[in-house]
A protein has these predicted regions:
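Charge-enriched interaction surfaces
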Residues: 1-466
Length: 466
């Protein structure tokens, strides 16, 4: 508001913004980024994506305490025993989030990837939440790029918001733009309309992420408050269906009220194997996202299931799958960009545009630098003990197996020609447990990725590492 007010107010706003940036990075020279400490970059990143810290890491606690002292982090509470830790964080503060957005634009996203990677690699971040953090990083970079695309790179105002279609084009690789913008509702809403037509006047506005305290935040009423504060909502850690909700104002000319709101609903998975195409459906009606008892209206919404942990999409599918509605009693052709999810016709259903993305590579995400794909895979733990081994010959892999890093269905010595007297195919017995991670769903997928199952022929089989 100050930006469009009296001329004397604009210099005051600029001075306040510069002060916020200086206090956030704890440095008077906000433009000379080479003089900034690594913790300055961490503070900026924390404001924007909400880093989940490892509660067992002493170094992580020290970093949080230093950010409370010098980088605008808020100490919420000190437990009554006054030992070990304090409860702290960056609350939803729009002005500070705008300052952090401008500072991150100054730093550049490639360098910030290193900060996030180091926190995950050194155990400072909560490993169970690293998939969600990477996804939030993708969304923040896409939002920054969309703002720059609409406003230019000189002094952009990130709190202004941007067109939802511009945001989608900044998020997904160019090869999928036509498919995403032209996709149809996957729940047989009549008459169907393309996503680009339904959201051509829609606006997204989120300069930071805020964790929802209860399910009431994941509603259209909650989206009103989130949009006003410029925040996207993070689901609770035990939420199994929804991880992130980005508020959408469907028409920039309408009032910001409940009847004008929708959302981009996202679920993040870090499984090493891609799930079936109809797994993890996101149904806004079942989630209670829209008001109960209200008549169905034409408000559309978009869903995304991001399977970041897989290295390749399922056979016959591309890296981005568009859910395709099916007509009853008639055959239809399904391309590699269309899923085979059967849908029931419901005249009261709101239009749902379903997307499913596989891998963390630049082939699906425009915000990913091709030179940093391997870094993202390392962050997400895509490589396993055997797949990351430098020598991928069967002889070398068998030598690794013989060191018994895991107990398999049959131990290594049992299939060895020396003990059996005849060669036995190792493929008959060996199965890398790390390649079968992620049989659960929701938060459990991240905290404990696919605990191996005990079988009758198995003596002992420890948990696969995350």
């Amino acid at each position: 508001m100050l930006d469009i007010g009296r001329p004397v107010k604009k210099p005051l706003l600029d001075d306040m913004m510069a002060l916020a940036r200086m206090k956030l990075v704890f440095n008077h020279n906000i433009e000379n980024t080479s003089s900034h400490k690594e913790l300055s970059h961490t503070a900026v990143l924390d404001v924007l994506i909400t880093i989940e810290y490892n509660p067992r890491s002493e170094l992580a606690r020290e970093h949080q305490e230093e950010m409370v002292a010098s980088h605008m982090r808020t100490a919420f509470s000190i437990p009554h025993h006054r030992s070990m830790y304090m409860d702290s964080g960056y609350p939803s503060e729009p002005f500070l989030a705008e300052a952090a957005s401008r500072q991150m634009h100054r730093y550049g996203s490639p360098y910030m990837v290193w900060i996030l990677r180091d926190y995950i690699r050194h155990g400072l971040a909560d490993l169970g939440q690293k998939g969600d953090m990477v996804m939030r990083f993708f969304l923040r970079i896409a939002y920054i790029e969309a703002i720059v695309a609409e406003q230019g790179s000189t002094d952009p105002n990130f709190s202004k918001g941007c067109n939802f279609l511009t945001f989608l084009k900044a998020l997904f690789a160019e090869g999928f733009h036509a498919s995403v913008l032209g996709c149809q509702p996957d729940n047989n809403v009549a008459p169907p309309s393309a996503l680009a037509d339904m959201f051509k006047h829609a606006v997204v506005r989120f300069t930071h992420f805020a964790r929802g305290a209860s399910g009431c935040t994941m509603t259209t009423r909650g989206m009103v408050m989130a949009f006003l504060r410029g925040a996207a909502i993070i689901g609770q850690k035990d939420e199994k269906t929804l991880d992130i909700a980005i508020p959408i104002l469907l028409d920039e000319k309408h009032k910001i009220e409940e009847t004008s709101m929708s959302a981009f609903l996202i679920q993040v998975k870090r499984r090493h194997h891609a799930s079936v195409v109809n797994a993890y459906p996101i149904d806004a009606n079942k989630l209670g996202f829209f008001p109960k008892g209200s008549p169905a209206d034409a408000r559309p919404y978009v869903t995304l299931v991001a399977e970041l942990g897989v290295k390749e999409p399922p056979s016959g599918m591309d890296h981005l799958v568009i859910s395709q509605r099916c007509k009853r009693g008639s055959a239809h052709n399904v391309s590699q960009l269309q899923s085979k999810i059967p849908r029931n016709v419901d005249a009261t259903e709101r239009p749902r545009y379903g997307l499913r993305a596989f891998t963390c590579s630049d082939r699906v995400w425009k915000v990913v630098d091709p030179r940093q794909v391997e870094m993202y895979e390392q962050m997400l733990g895509v490589d396993t003990l055997l797949t990351a081994h430098p020598r991928q010959t069967e002889e070398s892999l068998q030598l690794v197996r013989q060191m018994l890093p895991y107990w398999y269905h049959q131990p290594a010595w049992f299939s060895d020609e020396v003990t059996t007297g005849s060669p036995v195919s190792s493929n008959e017995f060996y199965e890398d447990p790390e390649l079968n991670q992620g049989e659960g769903s929701g938060a459990e997928d991240d905290m404990q990725v696919g605990s191996p199952k005990l079988e009758e022929s198995t003596v002992f089989e420890p948990e696969a590492k995350v």
